[in-house]
């Protein structure tokens, strides 16, 4: 339902403009000598202010003056409560109640739509700011690329260094294995030489024992020769003594004496030949054995000297190889320590970079989740807005139909009741006067509104102004009501 702007002449040049507005509760706050009226500024210097939210209202504060300018915007056909002593209103039927409920719902919807539009704008601004500040497309990763490239270069350098160290370790291990094989070969050769020396020492002991045995035999043969010579000399002496004792029968036994000397000479010759032969044989055998033993001893001594020299050289080579092996082992240990330190450092760096990447991925995931959540909320709000706009369009069509119907009625006549009472008072919503002493409280009701009891006036009687408005002109009549 809509009211066109009409002038209501009369009190203090007061003019009233009625139209469609928001479904709100209006209060006018007056001071001494002013008026309280909804959406109005009474008198000179009157103010108009409002607070919107939760079905909020507009507050108008009147000042001092004789005139009153009233500008009202009706959206709802709610209850108006007057603050006069005898304030009253008109009540309609079920149609008015339904229209009042529809107006209340429409006011709530409009308020909700405005709130959602503001929230939608705020969300759009926040989304734009987030997309500008934290969007994946606008973020600059060039610094990270440089750092990552440097780290890749370092990692490649460390990999090459590890490969070089591993190659050196393998070469050192191969050299150590080669030296170990050489050392084992020399050790086996030394063992064989020592075994040969031990065998030669056994042979030398055997030859020494044989030499000692031969020397004992030579001594025994010499003693036997001396004993035989002594016996021979004794026998010769005995025979000479016998010959001297039997000198008287020399002539008789001369032939036998010759035979005895001959026999003795032959025996002596035989024994001397045997002794000489045995001596020569023994000397030859001894010389042969001594020469063979000397040759063997010389050979063994030469072999022993060569073995000693070889053992000395082998020992010297083994010592040098052992020193080189120790140095290589120390180098391997140091390289292994360096490799372990490098691996630990690379593992720490890799763990740090992995944590940074995970943190950045988490932030990116949270950002995407927040954007998706806000987009979802935006879509929900947009759907709600569309639903509310559809309902508002429906209510607008209903109201336009009601306005057209009421316009036809108001073409003939439209009546309203203005109640003016002195003093302030009037509680509740609507248009209510509540000024101080000596003021005026005005309540305006239309034919489609229902008035309820409100406050109480602080002073005496008031006046009731009943206005009947037509299209062409407007007039009012005033009557006094006790």
From Swiss-Prot:
<keyword id="KW-0403">Intermediate filament</keyword>
<keyword id="KW-0416">Keratin</keyword>
<feature type="compositionally biased region" description="Gly residues">
    <location>
        <begin position="421"/>
        <end position="440"/>
    </location>
</feature>
<feature type="compositionally biased region" description="Low complexity">
    <location>
        <begin position="464"/>
        <end position="482"/>
    </location>
</feature>
<feature type="region of interest" description="Linker 12">
    <location>
        <begin position="240"/>
        <end position="263"/>
    </location>
</feature>
<feature type="region of interest" description="Tail">
    <location>
        <begin position="403"/>
        <end position="479"/>
    </location>
</feature>
<feature type="region of interest" description="Linker 1">
    <location>
        <begin position="131"/>
        <end position="147"/>
    </location>
</feature>
<feature type="domain" description="IF rod">
    <location>
        <begin position="95"/>
        <end position="406"/>
    </location>
</feature>
<dbReference type="InterPro" id="IPR039008">
    <property type="entry name" value="IF_rod_dom"/>
</dbReference>
<protein>
    <recommendedName>
        <fullName>Keratin, type 1 cytoskeletal 11</fullName>
    </recommendedName>
</protein>
<feature type="region of interest" description="Coil 1A">
    <location>
        <begin position="95"/>
        <end position="130"/>
    </location>
</feature>
<dbReference type="Pfam" id="PF00038">
    <property type="entry name" value="Filament"/>
</dbReference>
<feature type="region of interest" description="Coil 2">
    <location>
        <begin position="264"/>
        <end position="402"/>
    </location>
</feature>
<comment type="subunit">
    <text>Heterotetramer of two type I and two type II keratins.</text>
</comment>
<feature type="region of interest" description="Coil 1B">
    <location>
        <begin position="148"/>
        <end position="239"/>
    </location>
</feature>
<dbReference type="GO" id="GO:0005198">
    <property type="term" value="F:structural molecule activity"/>
</dbReference>
<feature type="compositionally biased region" description="Gly residues">
    <location>
        <begin position="450"/>
        <end position="463"/>
    </location>
</feature>
<dbReference type="InterPro" id="IPR002957">
    <property type="entry name" value="Keratin_I"/>
</dbReference>
<keyword id="KW-0175">Coiled coil</keyword>
<comment type="similarity">
    <text>Belongs to the intermediate filament family.</text>
</comment>
<feature type="region of interest" description="Head">
    <location>
        <begin position="1"/>
        <end position="94"/>
    </location>
</feature>
<feature type="region of interest" description="Disordered">
    <location>
        <begin position="421"/>
        <end position="482"/>
    </location>
</feature>
<dbReference type="InterPro" id="IPR018039">
    <property type="entry name" value="IF_conserved"/>
</dbReference>
<dbReference type="GO" id="GO:0005882">
    <property type="term" value="C:intermediate filament"/>
</dbReference>
